Every structure is written in C-alpha cells, then in structure tokens.
Amino acid sequence: MEKSVYRSLLGERSTPFYVFDTQGFIENYQALQAAMQQVYPNYRVAYSYKTNYTPYICNLVKSLGGYAEVVSDMEYRLAKKLGYENSRIVYNGPAKGSCMEEHLRSGGISNVDNPAEAARVAQLAAACPECTIKIGLRINMDLGFVSRFGMSVGSPELTEAINLLHRHENVKIVGLHCHISRNRWLPAWEKRAQIMVDAADRYVDGTPEYISLGSGMFADMDEVLRAQFGQVPTYEEYAQAAMRPFIRRYPQAQPIVFTEPGTTVVARYLSFVTRVLDIKTVHSRTIATLDGSYENLGEICTMKKLPLCHVTAGAGQVYASVDLMGYTCLEQDLMLEGYSGPLCPGDVLAFQNVGGYSIVSKPQFIRPNCAMVAVEPDGTVREIMREETFEDVFSKFVFPEEGQK
C-alpha cells in the first residue's frame, strides 16, 4: 500500500490501527485460484477463518465464491451469520464443538481427526437413521515434519475410526483431508497430493466428492520478506506440483480439490500503523518504544523482519541500529530488531504483511485492541473493526456491589 494512503488516514484517527487493502486481497485471491484452475478446473479455495476471522474479510471471500474453513463452533457460527450454506462450510480441527452434529445433519463438510470423533459421528448416525451423513477422514503424513493432527495411513487409529463409521449404512466416507503447514516447498506439495490420491483409492468408495490438501503455501510477498525465505515458488509452480496428480488420476469425473489458505491470501494485505513514543539508549542498546506491540503483528515478526514503511518522519537522528519495541511491560515485546535509518519520537511507521494470526491472537493485555479500516477498490475508507473500549474488556467480569468495595 502506498505511503500516501497511510498519511491520508492519519488525519482521521489516532494510532495504532490496522489497514486492510481490499483490492490487493482480491487480486491475490484471484491469481491463486486462476493458477490452480488452469491445471485442475475443479479446484476451490476454502478460506482458513482461524488465520483472520474479520467478518469483512470472510464475507469478501464469500463474494469471490470461496468456501469457509472453520475449526470451532465460534467460527462455524460466524460463517452461518454471513449466510453460508452448510454445503460450503468445511469443519475441521481436532476438538470440534457441539455444532458438528448440526452441521453434518445439514449436509456440511467435516473431516474426522481421531477415533473419538468417529464415535460421535457413529452416535449421530444411530440417533438419526433417516439422515445420510457424509464424512471425510483427516490423513496424517510425514513430509519432513510430523504433524500431531489426523490419522496415519494404515494405523490402528485410522482402522478403528473407519470401522466405527462403517457400522452404519447411513454414513458415507466421501472425502479426505490433510494439513501440514511446516513444509512449503514444491516436492512436499507434490508428495502430499500423491499420498492423498493413493489414500482415496484405499479408503473412499469410487470417486471422492472432495480431497483437501490443507494449507502451507508461500504467498505473494514484498521483496524485503521474500529475500529472507530464498527461492519462493509461484502460484503457477504450486499448481503444477499439487494439481497434476489429480489430473492424472481423475481425467474425467473430477472431485473438488481444496486448499485451505490463510496467510497465503491475507497476510500481505493487512498493515499495522503505529507511532514512536520514545527513543533511549540503555547501556549500549538503543530502544524505540512504539504504541503498538509485537502481539499486533502475529508470530511472523518473531521469525522474520517485516517490511516497514516510514510513513511520517521528523528531523530525527540517523541510527545504525534501533530495536523497535512495543508498549507492553514484556522484555520480549520486540517488533523489529536492528532498524537502521532516521527516527525520532512522533514518527509513524507501518508494519506490513501482518494479516495472519495477528488480530485473532492479540490478547487484551494492558490495553484494549485497536481499530481496523479497509481501503476499498474505489478508495473509500470503511471502518471494519472499531477500537475496543474499557466496557468491551470488563463487561464480562463481575464487579463488587456498591458498598462491598
């Protein structure tokens, strides 16, 4: 997003706040979808709500034809509130809530993570013999990182889960799911796709209705960030690696193939605007304190240096190395290590690429959470999340009655 956009917003609100780039999100989403569908026409996006469940963003995905991928009753209820049909909601996760049964009775997509969950599905089937319950299985695989989720091919747990489901004629295993976020490289994507094709032949009768490959793709990103990852695959390269096994196996009747992107589609298109409060040197370390926190940026700021836009600058000193620290009383509240350049109190900075696991992970620690605005394709600015208040934070607590204080 251009510096001028951030500057124009400063006249309307105080820092800190988030800025969502609607047009950038749409273009990136469509680029991912087009690359995949060029190779495999029946590809679909199921957007990961846990990554960023801002209703405006989730509804934007809905308007673009995407499915909702949820992992809790809270997220499921959000998708329903936004008007999703159950057939376009994918309910995953290892600890599904009580809405799972309602979702399955209503024709929704859900994937069994463990035998205990399979037993729940079996109980539902017994209690509702007139219902046809379609279910998927979550497959675990070793791609250089062994996830804790799902059940391994050939394992006793997977066999137990399948046996529980097969006891009921009204339960149909129609799909498979996997999710491995720790290996984003092309060989791993080709391998996971082939494993899923082979598992479908083994565990699904006939052509599956769907196979989900989960998430774990690099996104389109700023060059500052790209350089820290090395050779980042393009969407076209991912499409060739991940979709070709399905074209080979299903040349005619094609199941839906999902990926479940979160950071891939949203990370780059949210920025966090914050102000420098103070600069001081403690022993040999120069520290700038900002009115935001590393919690506002998501876990990526603990692993990589985020792209940074110096929105407004005063006549400050030029520093060789300044650690940009947050407002909290935590020693580890480091937003960016080793900033070099001019800086002075009052300067406004925009941290970019903060759309993933930021607002959904930010606690109400010391301060209420800040607002978010969206810049729409025509330039309109819309507030899509207001700043929290004292009442928002404390309304759920029980206070002592007057006279008991």
Where are these regions (language model features)?
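Charged (often Lys/Glu-rich) extended helix/loop segments that serve as interaction or gating elements
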Residues: 9-10, 247, 252-405
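A charged N-terminal "starter" segment
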Residues: 1-133, 163-172, 377-405
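Conserved, mostly hydrophobic/aromatic
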Residues: 25, 50, 72, 137, ...
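Active-site loop/helix belt of alpha/beta enzymes
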Residues: 141-275
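Short acidic, glycine/serine/threonine-rich loops at helix termini
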Residues: 58, 81, 101-105, 122-124, ...
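Structured core elements
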Residues: 90, 111, 136-138, 177, ...
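Active-site-proximal loop/turn and secondary-structure-junction residues that shape catalytic pockets
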Residues: 51-53, 74-75, 95-97, 114-116, ...
